[in-house]
């Protein structure tokens, strides 16, 4: 019996990588200016989950600045006006997501395909209709503490909130070496929390440690 080689093909992240880091930040607050600057400084990419229907809050970045401020990062939906959608009729939920998606696409000039559930609120019925609304991934509030890929990209739990042992998680992620597995570190939060807690140094230290790898 003759032997022959069977090729082994692995799914990889872009560039053939087996590990990736992503950051997910909600609400488009003024502190995003500083957060985006940090990400850009250390070569880190993030997703910013925004509301195209909130143009009256001076704590938020003006809508007409979205295209420039978030250039180079993903922009995703956070619904049009941030209602607690599990309490809303499904028709209204669809309107909230579609209006936000279309509004954001007009503002930034590129496709919007992600969602972060506002107030962490969602239901199985909402999940089921997301593909018909053009949404391919959606983040929830609970976290996993690990670096595996999600079973359902429309109910995507991140690794940790940035107040949840961020540096400890970052060091553990950096030490992962088995290339036969896919690993993702997924951090989420709100940029204003750094101001509220006076702990911007937490993100600065993390970005400096993890960036450029």
Where are these regions (language model features)?
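Conserved beta-strand->loop/alpha-helix structural units within folded catalytic cores of enzymes
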Residues: 25-28, 32, 39
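Catalytic grooves of carbohydrate-active enzymes
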Residues: 16, 28, 107, 159-213
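Short, flexible, glycine/charge-rich loop motifs used to bind or transfer phosphoryl groups or to couple energy/partner
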Residues: 10-12, 64-65, 105, 175-176
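N-terminal pre-catalytic segment of deacetylase/amide-hydrolase enzymes
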Residues: 1-23, 58-63, 199-213
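A short acidic, amphipathic alpha-helical/loop segment
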Residues: 10, 34-38, 65, 125-129, ...
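Soluble or luminal CAZymes and related metallo-dependent hydrolases
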Residues: 31, 58-61, 92-99, 165-169, ...
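Metal-dependent polysaccharide deacetylase catalytic core of the NodB/CE4 family, i.e.
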Residues: 40-136, 142-160, 181-194
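Generic enzyme active-site microenvironment
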Residues: 22-25, 76
């Amino acid at each position: 019996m003759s032997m022959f080689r069977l090729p082994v093909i692995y799914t990889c992240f872009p560039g053939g990588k087996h590990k990736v880091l992503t950051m997910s930040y909600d609400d488009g607050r003024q502190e995003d200016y500083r957060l985006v600057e940090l990400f850009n400084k250390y070569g880190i990419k993030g997703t910013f989950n925004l509301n195209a229907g909130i143009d009256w809050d001076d704590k938020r970045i003006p809508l007409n600045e979205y295209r420039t401020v978030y250039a180079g990062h993903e922009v995703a939906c956070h619904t049009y006006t941030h209602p607690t959608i599990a309490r809303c009729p499904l028709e209204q939920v669809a309107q909230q997501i579609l209006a936000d998606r279309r509004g954001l696409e007009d503002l930034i000039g590129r496709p919007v395909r992600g969602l972060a559930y506002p107030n962490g609120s969602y239901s199985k019925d909402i999940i089921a209709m997301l593909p018909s609304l053009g949404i391919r991934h959606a983040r929830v509030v609970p976290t996993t503490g690990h670096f595996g890929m999600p079973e359902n990209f429309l109910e995507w739990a991140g690794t940790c909130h940035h107040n949840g042992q961020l540096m400890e998680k970052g060091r553990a992620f950096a030490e992962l070496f088995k290339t036969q597995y896919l690993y993702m570190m997924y951090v989420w939060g709100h940029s204003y929390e750094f101001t509220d807690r006076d702990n911007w140094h937490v993100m600065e230290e993390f970005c400096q440690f993890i960036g450029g790898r």
